[in-house]
Amino acid sequence: VMPWGWNPAIRKRMLKGGVLEKNLPTPDALDKYRMKAARSNALAFRALFYFNKIDYTCGDGCCLVEADGRMTDISPDIVDRYKEGCVFKSLWSGSGKGLCWCRHGFTKNVSDWCSRALKENRGFVMEPIFDKVEDFAMEFYSDGRGKLLFVGYSRFVTDDKGAYRGNILTSDEQVEEWIQQYVPFEAFVRIRNMMQKALETSYATSYMGFLGVDMMVCRQKEGHPYAINPHVEINLRMNMGIVSHVLSDHFIVPGGEGRFSIDCFPTHEALMERHEQDMQSYPLV
């Protein structure tokens, strides 16, 4: 059984629907999964890339703020970086949700958000606002028995608050060509290989299923003009990147591009009307 993601409510619903308990994760396993899915786990990967000084990468200056007020620093210049603004991230949320942007000082709204996060989750992640150019992700699959496989890339779009807005449907070869306008291909492959090895060490025997690592291309004030932040977020579940990768493989002609997004409509009739319009305007063949 492989739902989009696991939580106690999904487990309960499946039991009620007749799925045998032996085919479902135990409550203890779900607790462990929840901890592995927390945003704070990306800090270990940040430290790995930072201390190994992997070329053409960025993303240092992040920390975990815990309920007792302690901060786990990743970079000594964290305070200076935060002068240009920072973003606070809930330990558990998805699709760009659970973010609090602090661009104009520590206002009451920001303070209230932090207080709620500490009360509800005992902590949150704090990081600088990076000068992002574009978003993308690397997708993997863990078999739960020690093997973690690279599935492919995905490119996606977010709004100015970091919320997910859709995917660009394109091939892996096109992504590798696209990324070379920012970093050398050899550096990109090194980043991918190091991430795959680190993920295999962390998850290959304790998690089975798809996982995606959100990354972004950032402008640099010093050194290389552009660098990759390779550990923005680790999505320990099925995700839109996997879906868009499958759609691209099956429905986009070689060398072509498409868009994948989710729209909401007030009625079934409105949805059907839009669907028929799109079928005529953007036929698959």
Each predicted region: which residue ranges?
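ATP-grasp fold ATP-binding core
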Residues: 64-65, 79-101, 119-132, 213, ...
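Conserved N-proximal alpha/beta basic substrate-recognition cap immediately N-terminal to
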Residues: 1-76, 93-94
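A short acidic (Asp/Glu
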Residues: 11-17, 97-100, 136-137, 222-227, ...
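A long amphipathic alpha-helix within ATP-dependent nucleotide-binding catalytic cores
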Residues: 164-226, 265-284
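Phosphate-binding site of ATP-dependent enzymes
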Residues: 110-165, 216-231, 235, 239
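Glycine-rich phosphate-binding loop of ATP-grasp-fold ATP-dependent ligases
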Residues: 85-111, 137, 160-179
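ATP-dependent carboxylate/phosphate-activation module, predominantly the ATP-grasp catalytic core
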Residues: 140-197, 235-263
